[in-house]
Amino acid sequence: MVRATISADIVSSTALKVEELTFLQSEIRRFLESLSEKSQGKNWGRLFKGDSVEIFLHDPHEAFRTALLLKTLVKKTFSWGKETNAKRELFRKYGIRLAIGVGEMRTVDKKQDVLDGEAIYYSGRLLENQLKSDKGRTSMKRTMLFGCNDESLSEQIDTMLGLLDVVLKKATSIQSEIVYNKLLGKQENEIAKLLNIKQPTVNRHSNSAGWNAIESAVKYFEKLNFES
């Protein structure tokens, strides 16, 4: 059966203060726990080496939304302004770099934290190559990537993620939080109450963050046939 994995790495994690990284790690762990609970254990993930994340998704159609949830979760965590420190500015803009892999899996062992197969090969290799490409750079071309055994589909989805990468790079903390909650399925009036702001403000930030494009991309991905 076709499954999906997400391999991810916090951008410029060494530039974060100890208390900032600790808080971010706790937010990511909470997100991973929620992911597992909502799927009754079918989906799961782990945070390792302090700044790396791996996620297994039983249903590959959930990968795009989950990746964007992880992206906006990290981006919404700290409400910084523009940073003079180059590495902290990279974190503010990008938050986390990630790669989605879709394919057959040979081994999925939650207890031993072991993943082996096509999906993790694609996501892991893409992320590793991007890390090498980004090393020493003060700017990044890509922080969201996609791979599967269908070259045409890979190119199509990868292009879509590249465009959303540009959109989300510009998103502020509050805009990222609104997109995050919309990805969870919450309505604007619910988000307004949650954030203690007015509904028109939610709508304005949502439009500024490119929500319509994000939603369209997610819905398109969720309709794909990965078994053919």
What are these regions (language model features)?
Residues 1-228:
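Regulatory and interdomain segments flanking nucleotide-handling catalytic cores
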